[in-house]
Amino acid sequence: MKKSALLLVVLAVATSTLVSCGNASTAGSKPPSNLTERVLASQSVSSATASGGLVIIDGQYDTLGRGEVSAGTSPGLMAISADRATLLAFDSATDKVEVVNTTKETLTGGIQLPGSTMSMVVPQPDAGYAAVPSAPLTGTSPGAVVAMNLTSGGITATIGVPNAQTVVSNPSGTQLLVFSNDSDAVTVVSPALLNTASPVTLTVPLCTGCRPVNAVFSSDGSTAYVLNCGAECGGTQASVQILDMTTTPPTPGASVNVDGATIAFLSGSTLYVAGNSPTNSACTGETTAATVCGRLDLVNLNSMTVTGSAVITDGYHDRIDMGNGGQLFIGSMNCTNIGNVNNVAGEVRGCLSIYNTTNASVVIPPDNGDVTGFQSFNSRYVEYVAEGGNLRVYDLFTDALLPPNQYIETGTIIIPGYITDVKAIDFF
């Protein structure tokens, strides 16, 4: 595949119409559900006993709220603005992005994408972006980042980036990093340059065989820490590489080799990096029937050195979140599943790992299936985890399912259908 992207900007206007989005609920004005600590879970299966939509959950008691928000027939992946006023849900049945006003708990409209997406960002309440690898473009290879106007509705621009898989925004939404499969370069998109004579995109080559797939920005947006997938993605050595975002074009800097790098979480000067290594994949220290395991590496960004490593589940790691209390939740898809959580006889294992950042211990909970969503809370010591289509509630004091109480009996919020993603739409 080409290592540099042939870039094309195609301006377009979609036919969908939206109304302006409101703010997340506050103590002074309750939403229709009458809840002030709300969580939305995307339920993506429609059947005789369940209908696709966004289920409203009382995040204080882990109970179902009244009704749900309509968002197509198969909503899955969700993205939310920093102020939690606007939520996007991708309907895989129609390739449409459904836009939700979280204050009114209503669908305000939908934007038709030119294909499927697995990556969306909402850096500003009125602007969203989706990576669409199959987006058809005249005269160039398929693939684009679709810029969406979330206030007036429609597609603002289709920005050509061949095979665009993942889009990451800086904190202010002024720069986007776009990653394409089998590429050793990253594409930088500057949305403010749309409709100007200046190029909207820049291609920044990295090292041969790097295969960059993702990035984490510093809090001020001046630095991006690029995750080079390396051998796991058909390249050579996995690494974390600094990208100086204050220069034009951005300047690649120092790098540090890691076992694998597909997802990461930044905490202070430590970057927690998860992935798989083709040469360091033994499940050392674990009692398990699994023959292959992944790795979590701890990178000190001040010295650009690896200061620790832990054995975690295998699979493609694409979900990560820090719980309230220092537990790092790492999720993957297509991992080694062992046993049956619904008929326990011996070891049960799935795609979830919990790393304790205080004592460096790892817990592999007895569950099955892909991990597709996380949600932590500032006011509670629990973590919501969407795994295998179920919405689990983990107790952060025990790293196990929440014990029975008057609101929840099984550590699972029972919702008919298949739960794909989960997002808090209030601050709590």
Walk through the language-model features, giving the residues of each:
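Sec-dependent bacterial lipoprotein signal peptides
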Residues: 1-20
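Predominantly soluble domains enriched in secretory-pathway, periplasmic, or organellar proteins
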Residues: 21-428
